[in-house]
């Protein structure tokens, strides 16, 4: 990290008191949000409050053993991230320290305090291919060259947004480190492949647009019923064991984003281990290249210091915005925003601020809004179009959706995927409750599905929603009087709804074929169930008893469409078989 260099250290202060991750210093020459180094070991921290001669600092490392009288040094710069080639296929902690580099420095699997490293390798050579010539005019955000960062990602070197721009007077080509100048402007400014950006400040864009294209996730219930747009926001709240992390992993694996930034914020370390183990073995369905080649991991697990959780979300979204400026579609997974909010609550209570609901700070809603509003579909300052989609998991204690983090998140996000403990106990996965979930992007995304999948996509989806709604209403009656007391048409509706639940809404994340379902296959499964519905009701009207309709041999084959590789032929055969068997009954 740029602030790790410690060369620009200014006036010293002295520690006055220590309370967990919050340190108070006296006589420190610093501004709000400046990065400081605390104590004899130089622990990294950030200024969060200044009152007279006292400066309050949140420290991103364990503070045990740090005491009053030890020095505090200010860098005079805010918390920034290093941006440049080398971030893909990397794994960072919450303040962008590369964990593999730290491990090699310490010869240990455990982090020592005070150890630091830049976010990207400043000495590694990259092949720079210029896209500008001498005499060209460039402005902030313009692309001046490209670097093959991974087999999947072409890294675009841009004029930093805080540069003035001007005429190109010198251009280099060949292998350079990220700190060497590759383009020189007439103003004397030198452009390198390395940029720095403060994490709490959104990167500028020319225009924020209405999203029109879905972020295809490969999960039937999401793409079919509750889609999220590229540049959209979604929340996945749910109790423990309901499948938040597996859903996030599925989205990180199969979403059709160009780049995925996965932020593990305060969750268990073995969940990040699973990502590191699984992703290198999987191929991107869009390009066929390894998934890690488009993925950046930020691991701030539950056994790491609380204060660093607060910064890891900002680190992730800043990296996402940087790739968005290159014209890429980026998906950011935050697992879990509840742990981030709990970190804010702890810092707030240490500062003795007035608590809000359930002890969370009064500014919880503002911080959540600040984060989610950095998502969007943008025209960048260089005229490219790029997006940042944010999908945040929420972990309400006991699955109580009325708690502050869930409620404040719901006011902001436009897609809500409610995970249900009852569905998880019944082994219905993904355990997304179709009666509570919603997407406000449906109408603006329907034209894309109509153009790219089928003309009657919206009608088929609405039919499925209506059947599931009717089943929900009938369930109350069934629990009172039993299924056999219902009229035959309602019994048949319950049977159709069962196939919708089992064949369409359920999906096996661990099956090699069923783990990813294209929009075309999602539509195909729905039309197969709809065809069974139409033929079954024709048979019922012709006087065939509902028991005989339910007993046909072809119907259970609907549940096996998801695992078929040659699903198109399978669906055609199945439709013909269902029609034939039902028509034999009347």
UniProtKB/Swiss-Prot annotation:
Please name the Pfam families in this protein's record. Answer: ATP-synt_ab, ATP-synt_ab_N, ATP-synt_ab_Xtn, ATP-synt_VA_C
E.C. designation(s): 7.1.2.2
The GO cellular component terms are: plasma membrane; proton-transporting two-sector ATPase complex, catalytic domain
Query: Which keywords appear in this protein's UniProt record, sorted alphabetically?
Result: ATP synthesis, ATP-binding, Cell membrane, Hydrogen ion transport, Ion transport, Membrane, Nucleotide-binding, Translocase, Transport
Which cellular compartments is it found in? Cell membrane
Topology with respect to the bilayer:
Peripheral membrane protein
Molecular function (GO) terms listed? ATP binding; proton-transporting ATP synthase activity, rotational mechanism; proton-transporting ATPase activity, rotational mechanism
Q: What is its main location?
A: membrane
UniProt cross-references to InterPro entries, sorted A to Z: ATP-synt_VA_C (IPR055190), ATP-synth_a_Xtn (IPR031686), ATP_synth_asu-like_sf (IPR023366), ATP_synth_asu_arc (IPR005726), ATPase_a/bsu_AS (IPR020003), ATPase_F1/V1/A1_a/bsu_N (IPR004100), ATPase_F1/V1/A1_a/bsu_N_sf (IPR036121), ATPase_F1/V1/A1_a/bsu_nucl-bd (IPR000194)
| One annotated GO biological process | proton motive force-driven plasma membrane ATP synthesis
Q: Which residues bind ATP?
A: 238-245
- Reaction equations catalysed: ATP + H2O + 4 H(+)(in) = ADP + phosphate + 5 H(+)(out)
**What is its EC class?**
translocase
- PANTHER family from the entry? H(+)-TRANSPORTING TWO-SECTOR ATPASE, V-TYPE PROTON ATPASE CATALYTIC SUBUNIT A
Query: Per its UniProt record, what HAMAP family does this chain match?
Result: ATP_synth_A_arch (MF_00309)
How does it associate, per the subunit comment? Has multiple subunits with at least A(3), B(3), C, D, E, F, H, I and proteolipid K(x).
Function (record text): Component of the A-type ATP synthase that produces ATP from ADP in the presence of a proton gradient across the membrane. The A chain is the catalytic subunit.
Q: Which family does it belong to?
A: Belongs to the ATPase alpha/beta chains family.
What NCBIfam families does the record tag this protein with?
ATP_syn_A_arch, PRK04192.1
- Protein's name according to its UniProt entry: A-type ATP synthase subunit A
What organism is the protein native to?
Haloferax volcanii (strain ATCC 29605 / DSM 3757 / JCM 8879 / NBRC 14742 / NCIMB 2012 / VKM B-1768 / DS2) (Halobacterium volcanii)
